[in-house]
């Protein structure tokens, strides 16, 4: 069995972008961490590029100073990397995640992360991303090194 309950023998590689996007959503939308705990929305999926967003909740996502908690920002950054890996057919785990915090966002506002692959190797993927507030002001620069641990055989490396 492959991730997402796919049997290797029964897998046909998808070719239409809308089918690939639907399959990636099918894999990640039911993810309890992304959907139930944080309510992360997958806004856009393209080959090697993903945008996710989060409507921040002042009751759940702030720290003792009543500003957006840095851990929430890191969780959103880490979540986009898995979806970005899947967009090129890779099942990935985080090896290193670096975030340069630039500014915070208003609690109750929507924040968004736009990612893109800068290196797609045989065993690793490097993903760069930027986090923005709802006024399109840069909040953080992100760099992630991901290890490829498996592949989604139905999702092509390029599409």
Q: PLM features: what roles do these ranges have?
A:
Residues 1-159:
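Terminal targeting signals and extreme-terminal segments of soluble enzymes
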């Amino acid at each position: 069995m492959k991730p997402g309950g796919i049997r290797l023998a029964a897998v046909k590689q998808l070719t239409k972008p809308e089918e690939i996007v639907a399959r990636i959503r099918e894999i990640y939308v039911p993810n309890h961490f992304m959907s139930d705990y944080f309510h992360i929305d997958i806004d856009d999926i393209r080959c090697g590029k993903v945008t996710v967003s989060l409507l921040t909740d002042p009751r759940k996502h702030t720290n003792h100073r009543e500003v957006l908690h840095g851990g929430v920002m890191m969780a959103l950054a880490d979540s986009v990397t898995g979806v970005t890996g899947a967009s090129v057919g890779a099942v990935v785990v985080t090896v290193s995640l670096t975030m340069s915090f630039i500014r915070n966002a208003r609690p109750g506002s929507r924040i968004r992360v736009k990612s893109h692959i800068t290196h797609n190797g045989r065993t690793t993927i490097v993903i760069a991303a930027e986090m923005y507030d709802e006024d399109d002001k840069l909040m953080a620069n992100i760099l992630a090194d991901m290890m490829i641990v498996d592949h989604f055989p139905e999702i092509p490396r390029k599409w």
